[in-house]
């Protein structure tokens, strides 16, 4: 792989590959992997051998509980003690080994195994297995997986004969004997046969696996054995550069020694150097047997056997020939022409060491400077070789007596002539002449001038041999010069175009990482992915190449590329050639690096993925729920559910993975066209893991934590609960009981949420509570205290014995004079149905609706529903998970918070409305106080008969006139009204007369009576002056219901006359009564009037402010009598008891109807005039 000299060295989690390799090395061995962090320890992986032993496929075994070691394989002969021992081992995360009897599922289809419907029945076969349990730890030293290894030892045990096996298998004695012999032979080569039952217990110890070699589940860099060197380590890199230098030394010295016939035996220094070089090259051969190399797929091969075979098949012979000690052989032979010259010529074989340079050329090509140096050295090396050949030709011609060769001319120029020595044995011998150094330099000078096409001519070819060699050298030099100096860039680009592209890609990636300051860990992952992708594709664009081919040829190539998927999965066996070609055209091949996330949680599942190589893990809630390997399929069942699903887990690559995936739309398109194949595909394709399905489980750590908390709560002392604590008071305010009656919503929106305010001592207020909680004694006290804190008023009288609190209803408070029984009122047609009695009478709370039995029934049904919901378990192996609905207190708290939010919003709206009205009143007051407004007491009448609240007050101050308004009041409910402050504004000497008749039953207030019956301590304020305003009894409300919206203004009839106010008398029901004011009260009025302001403007402003309070709280049904007459207000229901009669006044009220409509007409006399806002 160009540029990929290191190979794929990124940390990988090779746990699964190591376990599979170890299991395959042992006969009849299978294993399971279970998650140790999830309750019941679900199975996350099983190999093919286990599927054969158990009779189940991988999809059936995955996610099953391993707490009882494949409980689906238990039978009647399975030892209970062994099961308990296994469970104890898993719970305590220990390592153990024992024998266990399990049952294999067999699909027998014979005459005895067929049911009445003709279907094959599933039978089970007992078999003995040796089980080893080993905990697997991760990089944090936590046990994350359990490895369960099984080995079939049935042949070493006594035959198991049960009634089921005898009846089902129906084997004869001969068949059983043949079966036992066959199974025994399978183990004879590996395990001894144990017939003694006492020795069977030692079988587990004999077949135990060493815990030291147990791999860990973590990412690790590729490990090598201790005696194996990594080809990219620092020592090997330095060693390769030393070998490169020695190779150049060999390439220089070998031609020199051969040409100049230099005997190293005569030069001891050269002999020592050459011997050291030979030893170093021999050591290099040994190191090559223990050095890793990069495989075809880019992986680092560290297996010693594979390394040795690879080296023996490649460079071993050449390296061995180049390391032979030829100088040693030549040193012991003195014969120049014999075998010694042959050994001297064999020194040229050492030039084969240049193959080491070619072998590692890809490493040197990564550096530009090294490449230039290598090219220059190669050019000089060729010139050196040619110089040696040029000297050999000149020496040969000189020895032959040719005296005009270049060597004789050099001797003459240097004045070192040659001379001959004659001997009888060898003939004439050429001696003396130029020095060896001068001859070599001259030869090298000539070759360099020829190769560079310079040719100075001082050294030239003279003989025929020299000329022929010069011609050849010129040709070689021209090619070499053009190649090295003229077209270096072009040749390198043509020869290493893929390498240049690869380096360009790597440089771009490096610059990108440096520019954006990508972290080092992520940068290394990106670089490893780029290198691995290059190793798989070699820089080729697959789509671009396929586009060169026609459609038919492209389909054939795609089928060939996806042949592993089509051949391994049974779902494609029945597919036709056309169907396979259509599917292959849509398959996409992808390569993933370790740590890559293929799917994220919540991501749409739009592909069906087939794993060709590598392994992946499925992570849900930070726990490994499945480990997928070669041949597994994951995704979603598009052909069964057309909706696009979301991934419930993350899928992360553990190693370098090759995946073949097909898009959902493309797959459905092919299945829709090939309908016959679609049925077979849906039936035979089984997903190893469906990403849409979410597993519900509980972690072991969570269960332990819950147990510890439970124990801690038991040991902690109980803290005393103080009912008067401030926090407990606040929480008691937000408590609500479940909603029982739906009519409370109607009461909230009704018109009975306003208070009716009357003068003359009669006070009545209506409040509606849509959700009234059921209060205990302590809670009731807190509730009253909370009401006072909010600014409201609470009836301080002790509750009677008959008082009750009704859920979702309205409590009606009625005051009685004397010992009268309580009356339950269900509806009222007009506001102000409740009346107050004397000082000694207490308010009685009467229950409207009693639903105790119904509340108990609803509470019992709610408890049953909660119990059934707790008993509901999810569809998973975890039987401890329960779905808990929100509690009653939580629902009540949420409802209370929402109600408070609505109340706050309504209060803000009311405040805005009141601020707007005050601004309008101030503007009107400024106009009235302007010059010309006067201080008259009469107000102009409205031509339409309808008046504003301000006009009503003015109308009440005049004399004469009467009104007959007709109003209709919807039914309302009344609650206990708090005591209000009564403010009286009066003018002495005013009197009026009138009479009134009220249609319907109701309550009326007389114009005069005893003071202090309702509130003896109330301050009576009188105002004296000649402003024309009659005495007016008003009541200012101190607090209103929070949930009562402000009603619109009501139409009041114009009245005329002068009114005189007195303290309130006795309140009745259905009758109009009056009483003269006492002298003490009149004196008190007079004394108070002397202290009151006499400014008409101030009185008018005060009245307008009070009017706004009345308008916000009044009911739609109102009636008013004539000035100075008795006023009556109708009530929608007639009391069942006769109304009491009070003395002290005159007047009459005749009820003529029981409807909600009242038409009062006045006739009679009274001591004061009154403006009634009802």
Curated annotation (Swiss-Prot):
Ranges of residues in domain PAC: 113-165
Motif (Selectivity filter): 453-458
Phosphothreonine, modified sites: 787
Cystine crosslinks: none
Transmembrane segments: 227-246, 269-291, 314-335, 343-369, 372-393, 471-493
Function: Structural component of a potassium channel. Mediates the potassium permeability of membranes; potassium current is regulated by CaMKII and CASK. Has a role in growth of the perineurial glial layer of the larval peripheral nerve.
Oligomeric and partner information: The voltage-dependent potassium channel is a heterotetramer of potassium channel proteins. Interaction with CASK.
Domain of life from the UniProt record: Eukaryota
Record's protein name: Potassium voltage-gated channel protein eag
Record's bilayer topology term: Multi-pass membrane protein
Biased composition (Polar residues): 940-949
A biological-process GO annotation: learning
Cytoplasmic side: 1-226, 292-313, 370-371, 494-1174
PROSITE patterns: CNMP_BINDING_3 (PS50042), PAC (PS50113), PAS (PS50112)
Gene knockout outcome: Increased growth of the perineurial glial layer of the larval peripheral nerve. Hyperexcitability at the larval neuromuscular junction (NMJ) and memory formation defects in the adult. Hypersensitivity to reactive oxygen species generated by the redox-cycling agent paraquat.
UniProt xrefs under PANTHER family: POTASSIUM VOLTAGE-GATED CHANNEL PROTEIN EAG, VOLTAGE AND LIGAND GATED POTASSIUM CHANNEL
Intramembrane runs of residues: 442-467
Residue numbers binding a nucleoside 3',5'-cyclic phosphate: 571-688
InterPro entries tied to this protein: cNMP-bd_dom (IPR000595), cNMP-bd_dom_sf (IPR018490), Ion_trans_dom (IPR005821), K_chnl_volt-dep_EAG (IPR003949), K_chnl_volt-dep_EAG/ELK/ERG (IPR003938), KCNH_animal-type (IPR050818), PAS (IPR000014), PAS-assoc_C (IPR000700)
Span of domain PAS: 43-97
